[in-house]
UniProtKB/Swiss-Prot annotation:
UniProt-annotated location(s): Cytoplasm
Protein name, as recorded: Pantothenate synthetase
Gene from which this protein is expressed: panC
Active site: 41
Annotated Pfam families: Pantoate_ligase
Binding site for (R)-pantoate: 65, 158
Upper lineage: Bacteria, Pseudomonadati, Pseudomonadota, Alphaproteobacteria, Hyphomicrobiales
Residues that bind beta-alanine: 65
Biological function: Catalyzes the condensation of pantoate with beta-alanine in an ATP-dependent reaction via a pantoyl-adenylate intermediate.
Binding of ATP, residues: 34-41, 152-155, 181, 189-192
Other facts: The reaction proceeds by a bi uni uni bi ping pong mechanism.
Length: 283
């Protein structure tokens, strides 16, 4: 029978729980989440268990990474179900602060990064996003002091930005990217998939199929530009409104025009109805 994890909602409670976990020099892994947990999140937890003695999962819907017109108010909040899933995975500690705990009255600081990985892609369409992400992740690292932190590769640009921030600020956290977990039809698992209607859900895997087609063309010797154009046509013809479909250097996320320039990562973001989906694959 699974043992329920400790749930901390205040900083003193978190510090007490972490001190208990760290007895006998136990290593700690952090899995930052916004809740609404699915199998993709649980795969991060399982990787965390392989990389550290103790596992902490944060469940916090971070308001600073949402613009006023975005879905902060409607973002799914399912803490009871989340806690049950984490208990089944034998997570040691859940950090579930209120917004007022994370951002108390008078809070006026922000962590920003000017890393090349920030430029374009998500930053072009959600310019508020990375300032909110780096600030909350920086706070989580400082609060929890993990040895390692696990992030999903579905948010590939975020993974690169957080990795750079942790290194630049000497936070002492090894950031590990976990593989994207997909549904059987290829759709990347996401908490926002619940927004899709049945008709939209049937169309959604087109994003993944289009990226695979782009990768196939590039490997066959077609130019990156023509391959991206073909992929974009597949996406828009399926009914998406495309934000971007780009080829970037897999490490730096600099724009890339030829396979000779280095390893390629394809990244895509598009709206299907009211739902915005992102995904990426290696070439």
């Amino acid at each position: 029978m699974s043992r329920p994890p400790v749930v901390a909602r205040t900083l003193p409670a978190l510090r007490r729980a972490l001190a208990e976990l760290r007895k006998r020099n136990a290593s700690v892994a952090l899995v930052p989440t916004m809740g609404a947990l699915h199998d993709g999140h649980l795969s991060l937890v399982r990787l965390a268990k392989r990389r550290a003695d103790k596992v902490v999962v944060s469940v916090f819907v971070n308001p600073t990474q949402f613009a006023p017109h975005e879905d902060f108010g409607s973002y799914p909040r399912t803490f009871k179900a989340d806690a049950s899933k984490l208990a089944e995975e034998n997570v040691d500690l859940i950090w579930n602060p209120d917004v007022k705990v994370m951002y108390p009255e008078g809070f006026a600081s922000k962590i920003l990064t000017e890393a090349p990985a920030v430029a374009g892609l998500e930053d072009s369409f959600r310019p508020h996003f990375f300032g909110g992400v780096t600030t909350v992740v920086g706070k989580l690292f400082i609060q929890c002091r993990p040895d390692v932190a696990i992030f999903g590769s579905k948010d590939f640009q975020q993974l690169r930005v957080v990795t750079r921030m942790a290194a630049d600020l000497d936070l002492g956290v090894k950031v590990i990217g976990a593989p994207t977990v997909r549904e059987r039809d290829g759709l990347a698992m996401s908490s926002r998939n619940v927004y899709l209607s049945a008709e939209e859900r049937a169309i959604a895997p087109t994003l993944y199929r289009a990226m695979k087609e782009v990768a196939k063309r590039i490997k066959a010797g077609k130019t990156i530009a023509s391959s991206l154009t073909a992929g974009a046509e597949l996406i828009t013809e399926a009914g998406f409104v495309l934000d971007y479909l780009e080829a970037r250097h897999a490490e730096t996320l600099a724009p890339i025009k030829s396979p000779k320039e280095g390893p390629i990562r394809l990244l895509v973001a598009a709206k299907l109805g009211k739902t915005r989906l992102i995904d990426n694959i290696a070439v």
